[in-house]
Amino acid sequence: MSQPTTLYDKIWNDHLVHEAEDGTCLIYIDRHLVHEVTSPQAFEGLRVAGRKVHAPEKTLAVVDHNVPTTDRSKPNPDPESAEQIAALAQNARDFGIEYYNEFDKRQGIVHVIGPEQGFTLPGTTIVCGDSHTSTHGAFGALAHGIGTSEVEHVLATQTLIQKKAKNMRAVVDGKLPDGVTAKDIILAIIGEIGTAGGTGYVLEYAGEAIRALSMEGRMTVCNMSIEGGARAGLIAPDETAYEFLKGRPKAPKGADWDAALRYWETLRSDDGAHFDHEIRLDAAKLPPIVTWGTSPEDVIAVTGKVPDPAAIEDEAKRLSKERALHYMGLLPGTKITDIRLDRVFIGSCTNGRIEDLRAAAKIAEGRTVNGNVSAMVVPGSGLVKEQAEAEGLDKIFTRAGFEWREPGCSMCLAMNPDKLKPDERCASTSNRNFEGRQGFKGRTHLVSPSMAAAAAIAGHFVDIREWR
């Protein structure tokens, strides 16, 4: 009888090409997603070496990081961004790669469009020159970010050199209370393990609460695996995943679908499989969460108060948290609901999908954005935007005073025109609250879409569970 195996081990073993004596492995890569920021040097390396892209049909390119989310008929105001976008278009033509430019309705954030097109499939290995590639693990794919030199290696060989990670599992049982979402689950997990807690691991999410999530919710959870230090996040595929993928443009069809389904149904951790580390959370006890500092591990219930670092015994950690409070312009003991806001951003590869926009629109409908707040909604892709407009969500947002934008990474990161000004405070549905992440001296609080929408209307954080 074979030894029980984890989901990660199964996918890894299916893609292992060679293992050296020191544990260094060569694994086959099924899918490669490419964007404009981390690919120019990789393509130039191929040119210099006289190499072709090994498997262009397994490579998909899209612009997302640098594209403006306003009127795209006008020239890009940033020459460097415009150059990177033009370079990706040229590289896609030269190397025969499918490419979604900024005028293609299929364009969007790379981690939104992959699943949307059915390019992301269970049991595959997926890489991209972007740390949030872990998003695709929601489908039971082994997906993680790579560096630019590795982008070139995958383009040239369709393989990747790395060492195998350890197995970790986060089990979330129970039922989420009303107003508590997938975003709160992953923030709670990161708060529990810290931003280094998953280092050296691939993190599988399991349990009743995870199973109850939609695919959008599962993508939110897996998206932030890297914020917990993990190389990748995984959720075993099930009927929810199959239903999402069936009929997608790049998903298998007919007999190929039936064959794929038979394989996908084997993709789960066996009973008794060994995990090197495991944590457990009770979903029923989770509150809506807000980050207060400059690390995703700096989490607090919306009903809580900004903590006092003086109670931290470890000097390095205490100094780090004191610096975070100074940067954020907050005092210990401040009620989270007393924190007033300047900006609200709803979007990103964490929370820019149709379910996220519906949740925010439900809060915004019939209400008005606070006069002291500038709020924007940025769909994760052109197809999400199209669906939202078909449902009238854009009208709900614009009537309430939100800006309705074109798809892209937008204010998640300060690499395009959507940026915070110094000392502006933002409630954001994105994934990182680092110093300067959304703009020089910008102050970021991570929250769910419904929490962000409510904060935009109130002008400060509110407990969404009490929203009327």
UniProtKB/Swiss-Prot annotation:
What enzyme class is recorded for this protein? lyase
- Residues binding [4Fe-4S] cluster are 349, 409, 412
Q: What does the record say about how the cofactor binds?
A: Binds 1 [4Fe-4S] cluster per subunit.
Q: What is the required cofactor set for this protein?
A: [4Fe-4S] cluster
What SUPFAM superfamilies does the entry give?
Aconitase iron-sulfur domain
- Catalytic reaction annotation: (2R,3S)-3-isopropylmalate = (2S)-2-isopropylmalate
Q: Give the EC number.
A: 4.2.1.33
* Pfam families, A to Z: Aconitase
The record's comment on protein family reads: Belongs to the aconitase/IPM isomerase family. LeuC type 1 subfamily.
| Functional note | Catalyzes the isomerization between 2-isopropylmalate and 3-isopropylmalate, via the formation of 2-isopropylmaleate.
- What name does UniProt use for this protein? 3-isopropylmalate dehydratase large subunit
Q: What is the lineage of its organism?
A: Bacteria, Pseudomonadati, Pseudomonadota, Alphaproteobacteria, Hyphomicrobiales
